[in-house]
Structure formats: structure tokens, C-alpha cells
């Protein structure tokens, strides 16, 4: 196999694995088990917040955790395929130019959650799945966003507002060099560290994340309307 074929397979596997894993809607899975249709109850959104409304705090938290894990594990599977199979067909220079393409699985997982194959392309808002993806990409991104999301939620009691603020801030954070600590990789064998400020990698994440941010704001348009009218449900009103 030549390098071009290996790179093509990396892209295809990353996108397919990510999308198929992202398409698993755990709110619907638990709904089948508990005989409750989350799409007909509460806000009718198959996500973690509405799952708390419909199933209770414990199951809702479990739904959110599973949604986050699929974003993380999609990357892990892509990473394993790259590391144990496709990487051997690349020289050092080629490796340093394409290793980040494994993160396409994270992008595909969020798309799968929003447009799930198994549920007629009607999904959720991809907040938890994006969180799991951030954990796979950069610990700094993940920690900053988690702390920010928790602070806004605790202060305002609005989960939707916390999600929107976090996505907006992350859209800025990804432009900051050295914060994208790609800790799964060590592309520089001399420094043995994954901090980098390569413009094309930053551009790669921008081209993925900025359209996703626009999509998330669009998916929250009803929440934004309720926030402006002060009729949005607070976390104290979930149960």
C-alpha cells in the first residue's frame, strides 16, 4: 500500500466510524429499555438534559456520559487503526502532515449525533458528544470548557445558556496556539510533546468547529427565544 492509499483510508475510516458511532442515540436506547419515548416527552429532544426530565437524574446523567463517550471512543478507534495499521505506510514527514486527520472521527461523531443514521436523521444538539471529542483532542480545551460550562450553569441555572456560551468561547480558544495539546500523539520525537502551533492544524479545527458552532446555535434557536423571553427552564425545573 502506498502513502496516498493509507491517507485515503484514514480519512474514510475516521469519517465512517465517527458517524456510525455518533448515530447511536442513547436517549432513544434507554427510552426503549424504560418504555418511554424521549422524543414525545419534555422538550422532545433526544439529549441528556431532556433525558433528566423524562428518566430522572441518574439515567439522564448516564445518557450524557454515553453520548460523551461515543465522541471520545470514535477517535480512539480511529487512532488505533492509524497507529497499528496505516501509520506504517507513511514516512516521518508524511506522518507529521496527516496524523491529525484521525480527529475527523470526532467531527463525524457530532454530525452523527445531530443527523443519526438509525433514527431518520433526527438527532440531538451534540453538546455532550462534542465534550467527549474535546477530551480526545486537548485536555486544555476540555478542562476550560467543562469549568466554563459548570460555572455558567451554576450561576444562571440555564443549561442551554451554558452550552451556547461554552461553544462561543471555544470558537475563540481554538485560535490560540499551544492550547491544542494533542496528547495522543508525539509527532516530534525530539521534543516528545504534542503542543504545536501549526497553522494548518489550527485551520483544520476551525473548519470543523466554526460550522458546528453555527449549527449548535441554530439547534438552540427555540432555547434562545425562551431565554430572551425569560421562559427557559432552569436546572431546578428539570424534575
Swiss-Prot record:
Cleaved signal peptide residues: none
GO biological process, alphabetically ordered: phospholipid biosynthetic process
InterPro entries: G3P_acylTferase_PlsY
Biological pathway: Lipid metabolism; phospholipid metabolism
Key word Transmembrane present: yes
EC top class, as a word: transferase
Annotated keywords: Cell membrane, Lipid biosynthesis, Lipid metabolism, Membrane, Phospholipid biosynthesis, Phospholipid metabolism, Transferase, Transmembrane, Transmembrane helix
Subcellular location: Cell membrane
EC number: 2.3.1.275
HAMAP family: PlsY
The protein's assembly and partners: Probably interacts with PlsX.
PANTHER family listed in its UniProt record: GLYCEROL-3-PHOSPHATE ACYLTRANSFERASE-RELATED (PTHR30309:SF0), INNER MEMBRANE PROTEIN YGIH (PTHR30309)
Function: Catalyzes the transfer of an acyl group from acyl-phosphate (acyl-PO(4)) to glycerol-3-phosphate (G3P) to form lysophosphatidic acid (LPA). This enzyme utilizes acyl-phosphate as fatty acyl donor, but not acyl-CoA or acyl-ACP.
Protein's UniProt name: Glycerol-3-phosphate acyltransferase
Species per Swiss-Prot/TrEMBL record: Mycoplasma pneumoniae (strain ATCC 29342 / M129 / Subtype 1)
Organism placement in taxonomy: Bacteria, Bacillati, Mycoplasmatota, Mycoplasmoidales, Mycoplasmoidaceae
